[in-house]
Design a protein with these regions (language model features):
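N-terminal secretory/targeting leader peptides
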Residues: 1-211
C-alpha cells in the first residue's frame, strides 16, 4: 500500500477555460494547483492513523518502501510505459509521450502557501462555477473545492464564485453523468474525480496508473 499515491484530477470545462484570457488562465491554474496541494496535504494527514488501525485491528501487514524489492518490480514492469504510449498514439493521441514523461518523472516540488494575489484588475466576467466531487461534504475532495473557491474569489475580487456540490448532487449521484455534465459545461463547470472515472471518457487519464 502506497500511502502517498494520489490519482485525483481537478478539471474545468474546456469552453469556459478557453474563454478566459491567458492572464486569467494563469490565475485559474495557480488557484487549482494550490487547491490540489491543499487537498493532498490534508488527505495524507491521516495516513499514520489509518496504517495503525489496519495493522492493529485488521491484521494488515504493511511493508515500508525501503524494505521492498523495488528493483525486481521495476524489471517486471520494464517497457509498460512504452507499450501504453504506443497504444495511445495508435488512437491518435499525439501528446502521449509528453503526458507519460510528465507523470512518471520524480516529483521534486514542495507544498506551496495556499494563497493568491489580488488580480481583480484582469476584467473578470461575473460568473458562478459549480464544483462537484463524488465524495461527501466533509471529505478532503470537497475541502479542496472550497479552497479553490476561496482562492478564486480573492483573486477576482469576488467576480468568480464557486459552489461546492459533494456526492455528485447535480447528477443525482451518478459519477459518469457528472463527467458528461462537466464536458457540456452545464450544470457542472469544475470537478474533482479519480482518474478511473475520467478514463472512461479519455484513456489518457490512465497514464497516472502506470507503474
Amino acid at each position: 500500500w502506497n500511502a502517498i499515491y494520489d490519482c485525483l484530477f481537478f478539471c474545468i470545462n474546456g469552453d469556459i477555460y478557453n474563454s478566459l484570457t491567458p492572464e486569467q488562465q494563469k490565475v485559474v491554474d495557480e488557484a487549482g494547483q494550490k487547491a490540489v496541494d491543499y487537498e493532498r496535504v490534508i488527505n495524507r494527514a491521516g495516513d499514520d492513523e489509518i496504517m495503525d488501525r489496519w495493522q492493529n485491528e485488521n491484521s494488515v501487514k504493511i511493508t515500508k518502501y525501503e524494505d521492498m524489492d523495488i528493483d525486481s518490480f521495476k524489471q517486471a514492469v520494464d517497457g509498460v510505459d512504452e507499450w501504453y504510449q504506443s497504444e495511445l498514439e495508435s488512437q491518435g493521441y499525439e501528446d502521449a509521450k509528453d503526458l507519460i514523461e510528465t507523470f512518471t518523472k520524480e516529483d521534486t516540488s514542495s507544498a506551496s502557501k495556499y494563497d493568491v494575489e489580488d488580480r481583480s484588475d484582469l476584467d473578470w466576467p461575473e460568473q458562478t462555477w459549480n464544483f462537484t466531487c463524488s465524495t461527501t461534504e466533509t471529505s478532503t475532495w470537497a475541502e479542496g473545492g472550497r479552497k479553490f473557491g476561496e482562492l478564486m474569489e480573492k483573486a477576482t475580487g469576488g467576480k468568480i464564485k464557486v459552489n461546492v456540490y459533494a456526492a455528485d448532487q447535480l447528477t443525482n449521484g451518478n459519477q459518469s453523468e457528472g463527467i458528461q455534465a462537466l464536458m457540456n459545461g452545464d450544470p457542472v463547470q469544475i470537478s474533482m474525480h479519480s482518474n478511473l472515472i475520467y478514463s472512461a471518457f479519455d484513456p489518457r487519464f490512465n497514464v497516472v496508473s502506470l507503474p
